[in-house]
Amino acid sequence: MNIMEIEKTNRMNALFEFYAALLTDKQMNYIELYYADDYSLAEIADEFGVSRQAVYDNIKRTEKILETYEMKLHMYSDYVVRSEIFDDMIAHYPHDEYLQEKISILTSIDNRE
C-alpha cells in the first residue's frame, strides 16, 4: 500500500467513525470490511453473494456520500482543529489544572460514542 492509499484509508475510516449512523446497513458493512478489516472486493462479494463490481460500485458511491457529509457538516475537520487547539493549550499551559480539567472534559465529549 502506498502513502496515498494509506491516507485515503485513514480518511475513510475517520469519516466512517463520524457518519456511519447515516449510512445504510449494506454501506456500513461494505465500508467497514473494505477499509477497517482490509477485506478484498472478492472477499466482500463472496460474503454477501454479489459480484465484485457490485461491491466496488457500492464502495465508490459510499465514499462520495461520506465526503458529501463532511463537506456539509464538517464534523471530522472541526474535530481535527479542536484537537490541535487542545494540544496547543496543553503544551502552553501544562501547570494550569483548571484548564487541563476543562480540556479533558471537552475531549471526552468529542470521543464519546
UniProtKB/Swiss-Prot annotation:
Domain of life: Bacteria
Family matches, as SUPFAM superfamilies: Sigma3 and sigma4 domains of RNA polymerase sigma factors
Entries under Pfam families matching the protein: UPF0122
Assigned protein family: Belongs to the UPF0122 family.
NCBIfam families: PRK00118.1-1, PRK00118.1-4, PRK00118.1-6, YlxM
Function: Might take part in the signal recognition particle (SRP) pathway. This is inferred from the conservation of its genetic proximity to ftsY/ffh. May be a regulatory protein.
Protein name (database record): UPF0122 protein SpyM3_0842
Organismal lineage: Bacteria, Bacillati, Bacillota, Bacilli, Lactobacillales
